[in-house]
């Protein structure tokens, strides 16, 4: 009898190897899905945590000392630190009236 003919050519181990590969592929796909879900979950948590952190930081900054606010304002705007003090707020009313007077003078000059 020829060894290549009949049922003797198929062994159980060959089929078992294919089944093992199939199971390993399924386990790999399941693991990839789990890792993807975990990564998405972490990203969602970070997206929620960053605004919460920013809000608490801004609340703490707003309740902090005015010197710290002045330093930050001078750094952001490029204004010298001495010009960011409370005298600036006190002069706001004067500057506002000066601007209003200037506008009124322009209107008077335009009509005369």
UniProtKB/Swiss-Prot annotation:
Keywords assigned: Host cell membrane, Host membrane, Membrane, Transmembrane, Transmembrane helix, Transport, Viral movement protein
Transmembrane domains' residue ranges: 27-47
Location of the protein in the cell: Host cell membrane
Region ranges (Disordered): 77-112
Main location per the UniProt record: host cell
Membrane topology classification: Single-pass membrane protein
GO biological process, one term: transport of virus in host, cell to cell
Comp. bias regions, Basic and acidic residues: 84-98
GO cellular component: host cell plasma membrane; membrane
Ranges of Polar residues composition bias in the record: 101-112
Disulfide bonds: none
Superkingdom, natural source: Viruses
Record-stated family: Belongs to the nanovirus movement protein family.
Reported function: May transport viral genome to neighboring plant cells directly through plasmosdesmata, without any budding. The movement protein allows efficient cell to cell propagation, by bypassing the host cell wall barrier.
Protein name stated in the entry: Putative movement protein
Organism placement in taxonomy: Viruses, Monodnaviria, Shotokuvirae, Cressdnaviricota, Arfiviricetes
């Amino acid at each position: 009898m020829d060894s290549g003919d009949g049922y003797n050519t198929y062994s159980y181990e060959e089929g078992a190897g294919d089944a093992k590969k199939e199971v390993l592929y399924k386990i790999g796909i399941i693991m990839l899905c789990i890792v993807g879900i975990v990564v998405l979950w972490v990203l969602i948590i970070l997206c929620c945590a960053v605004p919460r952190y920013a809000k608490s930081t801004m609340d703490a900054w707003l309740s902090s000392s005015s010197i710290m606010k002045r330093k930050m304002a001078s750094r952001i705007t490029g204004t010298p630190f001495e010009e960011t003090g409370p005298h600036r707020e006190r002069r706001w009313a004067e500057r506002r009236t000066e601007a209003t007077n200037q506008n009124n003078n322009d209107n008077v000059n335009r009509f005369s």
